[in-house]
From Swiss-Prot:
Record family assignment: Belongs to the class I-like SAM-binding methyltransferase superfamily. TrmB family.
GO molecular function: tRNA (guanine(46)-N7)-methyltransferase activity; tRNA binding
Name this protein carries in UniProt: tRNA (guanine-N(7)-)-methyltransferase
PROSITE patterns xrefs: SAM_MT_TRMB
Function: Catalyzes the formation of N(7)-methylguanine at position 46 (m7G46) in tRNA.
Transmembrane segments: none
Pathway annotation: tRNA modification; N(7)-methylguanine-tRNA biosynthesis
Compartments it resides in: Nucleus
Catalyses which reaction(s): guanosine(46) in tRNA + S-adenosyl-L-methionine = N(7)-methylguanosine(46) in tRNA + S-adenosyl-L-homocysteine
Catalytic residues (positions): 192
EC number: 2.1.1.33
Organism: Chaetomium globosum (strain ATCC 6205 / CBS 148.51 / DSM 1962 / NBRC 6347 / NRRL 1970) (Soil fungus)
Enzyme superclass (EC): transferase
Length: 293
């Protein structure tokens, strides 16, 4: 009984802390200990997720409010169509029209974790809208609160307005969020290695998923990968090399890319590998032009 009470008290403290962080006047950076969660989540589980049926129905305005475009209003708007009578068993499922933005998301960090890469990329790529995708609830909340605090702390400079985070299962719903050839850069940093052979199907790089990356990444765009697990690195290289829509970027070009240095040093997992004197294996893959047929 005593152990259950301690767990309950800790849970209540976490909930109270997160509720306090959600207040508008809070600019303090969140503390990780109040957002702890398991290191990985099963992507095949039925998570309680909300996702658009089509990218055109995704409303990005809550993530990037400073990029909302005010639509011109007409002096005499047309009357609305008649609304059919509905019963409680027949809810109105008509999708709301998303608020337009001045630009679209062009950079995605798949499995963004606690947001280290997002925060490092934001000021170095001020013209790009950058999105972190994370399946774990508490970790997503941490990144949300982190971005909120950084925006408040840097309000005068207008920093971190171009970065957002979304809870999503990219193994299932990536094309629901992004149109064909929308993304210029995709980062896959220190993904779950799933060491057991029977779990390899859960790896974030596979023949099937690489086709989805090929769909959302524009020709000339880059997929960045990094891991401290050699077996996983070789797996990712093998599967991207085997895909007709990608070619591996040369090591010379790779090392000249400023995003590679950021990817190596700014993610939380990368810093952990550094502390333990581990190796970091990097590979970049360029999206090729589609055949002209």
């Amino acid at each position: 009984m005593g152990g259950d009470k301690i767990k309950k008290d800790k849970r209540q403290k976490r909930e109270d802390y997160r509720a306090a962080m959600r207040k508008d006047d809070i600019s303090e950076l969140p503390r990780k200990k109040f957002y702890r969660q398991r290191a990985h989540a099963n992507p095949f589980s039925d998570h309680q997720l909300i996702y658009p049926p089509h990218p055109d129905q995704m409303d990005w305005s809550s993530l990037y409010p400073h990029y909302i475009v005010d639509e011109p209003t007409t002096t005499s708007p047309p009357p609305p169509p008649p609304v059919p009578e509905q019963t409680p068993s027949e809810p109105d499922l008509t999708p709301l029209r998303p608020k337009p933005l001045s630009k679209e998301v062009s950079v995605a960090d798949i499995g963004c974790g606690f947001g280290g890469l997002l925060i490092a990329l934001a000021p170095t790529m001020p013209e790009a809208l950058i999105l972190g995708l994370e399946i774990r609830v508490s970790v997503t909340h941490f990144v949300e609160d982190r971005i909120k605090a950084l925006r408040a702390q840097n309000q005068a400079a207008g920093l971190y307005r171009n970065v957002g985070v979304l809870r999503a299962n990219t193994m299932k719903f990536l094309p629901n969020f992004f149109r064909k050839a929308q993304l210029e850069k995709v980062f896959i940093c220190f993904p779950d290695p799933h060491f057991k052979i029977r779990k390899h199907k859960q790896r974030i790089v596979s023949t099937t998923l690489n086709s989805e990356y090929a769909y959302v990444v524009k020709p000339g765009g880059i997929v960045y990968t990094i891991t401290d697990v050699l077996d996983l690195h070789e797996w990712m290289v093998q599967h991207f090399d085997a895909h007709p829509s990608f070619e591996r970027v040369s090591e010379e070009e790779q090392e000249a890319d400023p995003c590679v240095a950021i990817m190596r040093t700014e993610t939380e997992e990368g810093k952990k590998v550094e502390r333990h004197k581990g190796e970091k294996h990097v590979a970049l893959f360029r999206r090729l032009e589609d055949p002209a047929w």
